Structures are given as structure tokens and as C-alpha cells.
Amino acid sequence: MSKQGDAAYAWFLKGYNCSQSVVAAFAPQLGLTEETALRLSAGFGAGIGRMREVCGAFCGVVTVLSMVYADPTDPKDKSRMYALVQQAAEQYRARNGGGSIICRELLAKAGAVPTGGTAAEERTADYYKKRPCPELCRLCADLCAEFIAAHPEGRHGFYKEDA
């Protein structure tokens, strides 16, 4: 477990969505304020806008890896970023117990009833009891931390390991 994993777990328990929790856990290393990290990732929660599509925590992984590795000045960088994201998705599928990156599938696998609509659910003890989300936030942040540590090549200068 990483300090970012613990932080992502804590952010989720404070009421932030899954994507916000993962990105905010890396805000210091990315040179972002917490507010910027939370705003940047707000719409990706609950499977992107609560549509229960791609897991919001995994969207946080994509956001963090993009901030660390993407080079918008290099036209060939898209292919490299796509490969990095696909590697991360493969690792997430293998480690999340659901074999998926789809929010509704991960919720269903955990026995939670995936609901749609735009209204965020109230965060109660029962909500946390039936959701895999806090642990998935931890897993995604751990996955990012491990990935970044294992792939120092290609990182851009603004990533601060010690922050």
C-alpha cells in the first residue's frame, strides 16, 4: 500500500467521488492544489457523470498518468499514452476482483445495485458497507504509485516524488 492509496481511501470517505479521490491523492506530486485536482476530476465520478460506464477511480488513474507522462508537444506521444493506459487497465482488471473497468459491473460483482440518474447518493454507513469504491480508490492510487515508480523514464519534470 502507498501513501497515495491511503489518501485516496480517505478522500472517498470524506464524501468526494472516486475519480476526485484518486487525483487528489496525487495533487502534491503533480503540483496541483487540492481544489484544482478536485475540480479537474469531478465529472468522472460514478462511472463518468454517474452513467456507470468506465470506473471513475480508473479515470483518475488515466488523469494522473496523463499528467505524469503525456507530452502534448510530441505528435507520436498519443500511441505511447494509449499503451500506458492499456497496461494500467490490464493491471486494474487483474487486481480489482471484478475483472472489469466498468463501474456498473464492478458494483454488481460486489453485490451493490448500480443506480443511474444524476442525484448523488447520500453517504451513509450502509452506503459504504455495500460499496467496493473506497477500496477501488485505494487500489487505483496504489496502482498509479507502483506504475510511476516502475517507469521513471518519460516522466515530465513537474512530477515531485517527495511532495
Q: What residue ranges belong to the model's regions?
A:
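Polybasic, low-complexity association/targeting segments
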Residues: M1-K14
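Extended beta-strand/beta-hairpin segments
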Residues: L13-Y16, L30
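Phosphate-handling active-site elements
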Residues: Q29-R39, L65-Q87, P152-R155
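C-terminal binding/interaction regions
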Residues: V85-A163
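Acidic-glycine-rich active-site phosphate/pyrophosphate-binding loop
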Residues: A25-G43, V113-T118
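Glycine/serine-rich anion-binding loops at beta->alpha junctions
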Residues: Y16, F44-T63
